[in-house]
């Protein structure tokens, strides 16, 4: 039945491309989460009126975040070709996409983390400070737990954005469903391959959104 309607789709290639897309997304998402949380915390903590208020440090971090967040992903890949070749030894394949994916998504998530932390009730923070809580205690016992639903929503949005970025990376040689859709579909004039690859990308996005919403609803006690 499948071969009848999609004669040009190689199932082995499809599953391999799906695996490569998931691999690129999950690995880069892990690094983006860690780096994004650190940058987001620093942006919040060094902002005016916060625990580590420091205008100079905040301005530098904000500038770095804004610069890399603003560069279109395709251009970012091109700019990082030399760095990517040095880091992973190649500019082709799933691993070659990881540096650009991480550098492109971490600043994006950092801003979402900062926004999530700003939504935490200042009264709760002040109460913790008045009780003599250390900064580390406030961060790990107050800020992060209180902002967790927003942090999960943010990482869900970041993951979905990464799926789109992997498709762009795939179109220029990084593998995945984007590469399958472009090379085996568009360039080979196989509309069915492009269609199936697109459907698989949509399915992955829907699954990520459902999981993200489910986790957010479970931990959101408001």
Swiss-Prot record:
UniProt keyword terms in alphabetical order: Amino-acid transport, Cell membrane, Membrane, Transmembrane, Transmembrane helix, Transport
GO CC terms: plasma membrane
Membrane disposition: Multi-pass membrane protein
Induction of synthesis: Repressed by methionine via the S-box system.
Organism: Bacillus subtilis (strain 168)
Function, as annotated: Part of the ABC transporter complex MetNPQ involved in methionine import. Responsible for the translocation of the substrate across the membrane. It has also been shown to be involved in methionine sulfoxide transport.
Gene3D superfamilies in alphabetical order: MetI-like
Bilayer-crossing regions: 25-45, 73-93, 97-117, 152-172, 195-215
Annotated localization: Cell membrane
Family named by the database record: Belongs to the binding-protein-dependent transport system permease family. CysTW subfamily.
Subunit structure: The complex is composed of two ATP-binding proteins (MetN), two transmembrane proteins (MetP) and a solute-binding protein (MetQ).
PANTHER family cross-referenced by the UniProt entry: ABC TRANSPORTER PERMEASE, D-METHIONINE TRANSPORT SYSTEM PERMEASE PROTEIN METI-RELATED
One Pfam assignment: BPD_transp_1
Domain ABC transmembrane type-1: 18-212
Protein name: Methionine import system permease protein MetP
Ranges in coiled-coil conformation: none
Gene Ontology biological process terms from the UniProt entry: D-methionine transmembrane transport
Main location: membrane
């Amino acid at each position: 039945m499948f071969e009848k309607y999609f004669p040009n789709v190689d199932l082995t290639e499809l599953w391999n491309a799906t695996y490569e897309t998931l691999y690129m997304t999950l690995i880069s998402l892990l690094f983006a989460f860690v780096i994004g949380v650190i940058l987001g915390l620093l942006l919040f903590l060094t902002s005016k009126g916060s625990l580590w208020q420091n205008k100079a440090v905040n301005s530098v971090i904000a500038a770095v975040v804004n610069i890399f967040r603003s560069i279109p992903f395709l251009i970012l890949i091109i700019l990082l070709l030399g760095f990517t070749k040095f880091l992973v030894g190649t500019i082709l394949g799933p691993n070659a996409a990881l540096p650009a994916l991480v550098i492109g998504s971490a600043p994006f998530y950092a801003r979402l983390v900062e926004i999530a932390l700003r939504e935490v009730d200042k009264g709760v923070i002040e109460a913790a400070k008045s009780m003599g809580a250390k900064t580390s205690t406030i961060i790990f016992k107050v800020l992060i737990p209180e902002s967790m639903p927003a942090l999960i929503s943010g990482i869900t949005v970041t993951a979905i954005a990464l799926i789109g970025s992997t498709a762009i990376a795939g179109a220029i040689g990084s593998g995945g469903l984007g590469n399958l859709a472009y090379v085996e579909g568009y360039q080979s004039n196989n509309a069915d391959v492009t269609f199936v690859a697109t459907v698989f990308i949509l399915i992955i996005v829907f699954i990520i959104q459902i999981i993200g919403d489910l986790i957010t609803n479970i931990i959101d006690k408001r």
